[in-house]
């Protein structure tokens, strides 16, 4: 009986110590391979990627809108033609392409709620800490880098560049407001 009790006591101690030191790192929870997704030209949360055919997208989004309306649901979807670009907006994501480069497909994607695992409202430090091994540039939000934001905001942008793809995180009052992905070869 003493041997069994001793054996159980030893097992309890061994398992207790083996569980120590296994704290989850909060940064590891949000870790995503930006370089991999930049190479693919996509955001993991998004159904479409860079280079997608705009006509096919509009066709699919129009069908989704019709299905939602038939079911009595709302589906925000709009196509807006500008002088040089076309904007396709379905609520959570906004897609752009340049009219002169339509054959190259979608060249700019904007996530308004969540991008690369980061929810809207995440802090700039949270993203920097989750991606410590990647080089980035930090700049102020201005008209040229935030053309898609309605109205002027005072904030900053973290830019991660991988060859011809750029992933940017936009912050206003230290809260994530948008995440973008674009192709420098197909976007002016």
Which stretches of residues belong to each language-model region?
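Positively charged n-region of N-terminal signal peptides that target proteins for export
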Residues: 1-4
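Post-signal peptide N-terminal segment of mature Sec-exported envelope proteins
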Residues: 28-43
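C-terminal motif of bacterial Sec signal peptides marking the signal peptidase cleavage site
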Residues: 16-19
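Internal alpha-helical transmembrane segments of multi-pass membrane proteins, especially GPCRs
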Residues: 6-9
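Bacterial signal peptide processing site
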Residues: 21-23
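Second-shell loop/turn segments in exported
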Residues: 41-48, 111-119
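A cross-family detector of function-defining hotspots
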Residues: 52-101, 124-178, 184-188
């Amino acid at each position: 009986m003493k041997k069994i009790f001793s054996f159980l006591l030893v097992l309890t101690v061994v398992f207790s110590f083996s569980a120590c030191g296994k704290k989850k790192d909060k940064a590891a929870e949000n870790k995503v391979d930006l370089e991999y997704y930049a190479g693919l030209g996509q955001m993991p949360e998004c159904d479409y990627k860079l280079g997608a055919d705009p006509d096919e997208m509009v066709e699919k989004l129009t069908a989704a809108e019709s299905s939602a309306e038939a079911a009595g649901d709302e589906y925000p979807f709009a196509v807006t033609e500008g002088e040089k670009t076309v904007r396709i907006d379905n609520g959570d994501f906004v897609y752009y392409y340049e009219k002169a480069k339509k054959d190259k497909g979608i060249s700019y994607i904007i996530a308004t709620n969540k991008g690369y695992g980061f929810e809207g409202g995440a802090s700039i430090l949270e993203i920097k800490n989750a991606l410590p091994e990647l080089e980035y540039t930090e700049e102020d939000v201005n008209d040229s880098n935030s053309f898609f934001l309605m109205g002027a905001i005072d904030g900053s942008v973290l830019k991660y560049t991988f060859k011809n793809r750029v992933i940017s995180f936009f912050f206003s009052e230290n809260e994530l407001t948008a995440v973008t992905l674009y192709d420098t070869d197909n976007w002016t």
